[in-house]
């Protein structure tokens, strides 16, 4: 087998720091919405140069929230279409459809698995 990425090596590089962080959270009894979450949200917001950050439990939650926010802000409305690669994970589709939006699947390139501008243009209705 050809090793692609040894996650064990990557993890071992940060073993003590990771173990200490996990132990702090476990000992605090706050697994969600505690000080560690607040600190992460603050630090990550600063890192990416924005004022706010909301930690999410998974990608679906994050996608659901952003599409809901777009609807609340009037950027999107029920039935609006969202173009996604046909090989996307189901959470992408559910985050869209669970907000009353319509996913539009576009076939990706075989060599990169990405969609290209011309395919996006074809998927946009006139």
Language model feature labels by segment:
Residues 71-126:
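PLP-dependent aminotransferase-like
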Residues 6, 55, 84:
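Small/polar loops that bind or transfer phosphate-bearing groups
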Residues 1-30, 35:
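N-terminal "arm"/small-domain region of PLP-dependent enzymes with the aminotransferase-like
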